[in-house]
Amino acid sequence: MRLEELKAPAGANKRTKRVGRGTGSGHGKTSTRGHKGQKSRSGGGVRPGFEGGQMPLQRRLPKRGFNNIFKKVYAIVNVEDLNIFPDGSEVNPDTLQETGLVKAIKDGVKILGNGVLEKRLQVKAHKISKQAEEKITAKGGKVEVI
């Protein structure tokens, strides 16, 4: 086998359909658009979601729910993520943001109890779950709600 003997597999190189180039091509005259009608015109066609005048699906379905403007969104950090901090250090929302565990503090930081904590830490957060508090205090750490 040599480089000049390489050949693309059958069907790999498909020829483009050149329309409007004479009747002999089979795609001349109306350029595969048929005769008259909205879809034959330039710029013709219906918008996405248009169902021919029938009530469209997105208007048939009922509206549901609302957005609570008072909802608090907390940045979530699990206990296992806190193992990156050195033993005996203080963990607060600012240090979490500096290390990249939290991108944005939002309405506060909540510590959840997923995983195993191997360090003794002083944790300050806006909310802390019971499991997380138990795991932190079991290692000799302190928990403070801001």
Curated annotation (Swiss-Prot):
Keyword Nucleotide-binding included in the entry's annotation: no
Biased composition range(s): Basic residues: 30-39
SS bonds (residue pairs): none
UniProt region (Disordered), positions on chain: 1-59
SUPFAM superfamilies: Ribosomal proteins L15p and L18e
Superkingdom to which the source organism belongs: Bacteria
Matches recorded under InterPro entries: Ribosomal_uL15, Ribosomal_uL15/eL18, Ribosomal_uL15/eL18_sf, Ribosomal_uL15_bac-type, Ribosomal_uL15_CS
Coiled-coil annotated spans: none
Gene Ontology MF term list: rRNA binding; structural constituent of ribosome
One BP annotation, GO: translation
Biased composition regions of type Gly residues, renumbered to the chain: 42-52
Keyword tags: Ribonucleoprotein, Ribosomal protein, RNA-binding, rRNA-binding
GO cellular component term of the entry, any: cytosolic large ribosomal subunit
Subunit structure, as described in the record: Part of the 50S ribosomal subunit.
Family: Belongs to the universal ribosomal protein uL15 family.
Function of the molecule: Binds to the 23S rRNA.
Protein name per the record: Large ribosomal subunit protein uL15
Lineage: Bacteria, Bacillati, Bacillota, Clostridia, Eubacteriales
This protein's encoding gene: rplO
